[in-house]
Curated annotation (Swiss-Prot):
Any one of the GO CC terms: small ribosomal subunit
Any Pfam family: Ribosomal_S7
GO molecular function: rRNA binding; structural constituent of ribosome; tRNA binding
Organism for this UniProt entry: Geobacter sp. (strain M21)
Biological process, per Gene Ontology: translation
KW Ribosomal protein (keyword) present: yes
Native organism taxonomy: Bacteria, Pseudomonadati, Thermodesulfobacteriota, Desulfuromonadia, Geobacterales
Coiled-coil stretches noted in the UniProt entry, renumbered to this chain: none
Keyword Transcription: no
Protein keywords: Ribonucleoprotein, Ribosomal protein, RNA-binding, rRNA-binding, tRNA-binding
Protein name, entry field: Small ribosomal subunit protein uS7
Subunit note: Part of the 30S ribosomal subunit. Contacts proteins S9 and S11.
Family label: Belongs to the universal ribosomal protein uS7 family.
Role of this protein: One of the primary rRNA binding proteins, it binds directly to 16S rRNA where it nucleates assembly of the head domain of the 30S subunit. Is located at the subunit interface close to the decoding center, probably blocks exit of the E-site tRNA.
């Protein structure tokens, strides 16, 4: 238990265009070297492209895309008597969203399109349609948890 007072959680203000906290958080994850306006342009452009192809509202497309990426289970290493077990644990709701966002940005950057906007739009659309690298990452995480189900009683 920490002896100091608990640190207050920073409140993230909603983004200016869609007035949505999830979009604001994703902008912060995309941002490099403090260039927020560049990150905003990239994400807003990607959301418009994805929404145009999906035929829905940009925020709805993004939220459905993130829902398709969110992991329900993950594995954590637990050392028991000289050997390390991969113990499956349920993912906290805030961590689900943050992992989904990080995976979305990571795998969109690994894509072969030319601009960041196109890369993001492509990965958002793929995740929206339940395919793509970020969704594969979620499936792999779930498979890993399922494979180590025998160690679930080591949860803490």
């Amino acid at each position: 238990m920490p002896r100091r007072r608990e640190v207050a959680k920073r409140v993230i203000l909603p983004d200016p265009k869609y007035a949505d906290r999830v979009v604001a958080k994703l902008i912060n994850i995309i941002m490099l070297d403090g260039k927020k306006s560049t990150a905003e342009k990239a994400l807003y452009g990607a959301m418009e492209i994805a929404a145009g192809k999906a035929g829905e509202e940009p925020v709805k497309v993004l939220k459905k895309c993130l829902d398709n990426i969110k992991p329900m289970l993950e594995v954590k290493s637990r050392r028991v008597g000289g050997s390390t077990y991969q113990v499956p644990v349920e993912v906290r709701p805030e961590r689900r969203v943050s992992l989904a966002m990080r995976w979305l940005v990571k795998y969109s950057n690994a894509r072969s399109e030319k601009t960041v906007t196109d890369k993001l739009a492509g990965e958002i659309l793929d995740a929206y349609n339940n395919r793509g690298s970020a969704v594969k990452k979620r499936e792999d995480t779930h498979k890993m948890a399922e494979a180590n189900r025998a160690f679930a009683h080591y949860r803490w």
